[in-house]
C-alpha cells in the first residue's frame, strides 16, 4: 500500500491516474471522498480531494479527522498537502509557491484532536512540518526555476467568509499568507506521527492591499499554479526516500499524559 498521501484539489489529476478506489470507514465518519490510489512517476500514492469529489465541503466542514485517519489506516506515513492562499505581504506574489514552515490558528470550532479522552495527548507543534520533505520540495522547486519561498507563516481562519480589511491588516503583522484549510489537518497528522509538508500557492493579495479583485485574473493564476504544482510533484516525489530519517514519528514518545 502507498506510504505517500496527497491532500489537495482537482489539479492533482493532471499527474495522477487512479488505478484503485478504496472506501475507508473511520471512527470519525467518512472521508471527503473515497481514497484513490495510483502512481506518480512510478511511485505509489494515495489521494484525497480535500473538499470532496465535487467540492461539496466548505473549509469549516471538511472531515479532517476522517481524512487523516483514513490515510493512516492505509499505511501512509507522509502527507503532501496542497493549498491555495491569499498573500499578506507584497513580496509573496500571485503565482508564487510557499513551502510553509509555521502557522497561526485563528479557526474557532473544528475537531482538533484524536484524543478527546480518556487518553489525553499534548503534541509538540514547535516545528510542525517535516524538515526532510520541506528540503526536498524547496530544492526541487529551485531546480525547476519555480517562484518559491523557502519559508512562510500561514494564518488559518475559520471561513467560509473572507477577512475584513481590519482583520487582514492585523494578520499582516505576524503572517505571510492566509487560508482556511491547514488547521487542523497539520496537527492531526502530527498526532499520528505522520510527516506533513504544505505547498501553498498564492492566488491573489488579501483585502489589505485594497486592490480590486479580478475574477478572471484569479482563475488564470489558479490554472498556472496547478501546472506548477504538477511539475513539482512529478519531480519531487521520486526523490522521497523509502525510509524516514526526520524524527516526525518521535513525537509519539512524549505526547501522552
From Swiss-Prot:
Pathway: Amino-acid biosynthesis; L-methionine biosynthesis via salvage pathway; S-methyl-5-thio-alpha-D-ribose 1-phosphate from S-methyl-5'-thioadenosine (phosphorylase route): step 1/1. Keywords: Glycosyltransferase, Purine salvage, Transferase. It comes from the Archaea. Phosphate binds at residues 10, 50-51, 181. GO terms for cellular component: cytosol. Homohexamer. Dimer of a homotrimer. Catalyzes the reversible phosphorylation of S-methyl-5'-thioadenosine (MTA) to adenine and 5-methylthioribose-1-phosphate. Involved in the breakdown of MTA, a major by-product of polyamine biosynthesis. Responsible for the first step in the methionine salvage pathway after MTA has been generated from S-adenosylmethionine. Has broad substrate specificity with 6-aminopurine nucleosides as preferred substrates. This is S-methyl-5'-thioadenosine phosphorylase.
Amino acid at each position: 500500500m502507498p506510504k505517500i498521501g496527497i491532500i489537495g484539489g482537482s489539479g492533482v489529476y493532471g499527474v495522477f491516474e487512479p488505478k484503485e478506489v478504496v472506501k475507508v470507514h473511520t471512527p470519525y465518519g467518512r472521508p471527503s471522498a473515497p481514497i484513490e490510489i495510483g502512481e506518480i512517476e512510478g511511485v505509489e500514492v494515495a489521494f484525497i480531494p480535500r473538499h470532496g469529489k465535487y467540492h461539496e465541503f466548505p473549509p469549516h466542514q471538511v472531515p479532517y479527522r476522517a481524512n487523516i485517519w483514513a490515510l493512516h489506516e492505509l499505511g501512509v506515513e507522509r502527507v503532501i498537502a496542497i493549498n491555495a492562499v491569499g498573500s499578506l505581504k507584497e513580496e509573496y506574489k500571485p503565482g508564487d509557491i510557499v513551502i510553509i514552515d509555521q502557522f497561526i490558528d485563528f479557526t474557532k470550532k473544528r475537531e482538533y484532536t484524536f484524543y478527546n479522552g480518556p487518553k489525553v495527548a499534548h503534541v509538540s507543534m514547535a516545528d510542525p512540518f517535516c524538515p526532510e520533505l520541506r528540503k526536498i520540495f524547496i530544492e526541487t522547486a529551485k531546480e525547476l526555476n519555480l517562484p518559491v519561498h523557502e519559508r512562510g507563516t500561514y494564518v488559518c481562519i475559520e471561513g467560509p467568509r473572507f477577512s475584513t480589511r481590519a482583520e487582514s491588516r492585523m494578520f499582516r503583522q505576524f503572517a505571510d499568507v492566509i487560508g482556511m484549510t491547514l488547521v487542523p489537518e497539520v496537527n492531526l497528522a502530527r498526532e499520528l506521527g505522520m510527516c506533513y509538508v504544505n505547498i501553498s500557492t498564492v492566488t491573489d493579495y488579501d483585502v489589505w492591499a485594497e486592490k480590486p479583485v479580478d475574477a478572471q485574473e484569479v482563475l488564470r493564476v489558479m490554472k498556472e499554479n496547478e501546472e506548477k504544482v504538477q511539475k513539482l510533484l512529478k519531480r519531487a516525489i521520486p526523490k522521497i526516500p523509502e525510509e524516514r530519517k526526520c524524527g516526525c514519528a518521535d513525537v509519539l514518545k512524549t505526547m501522552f499524559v
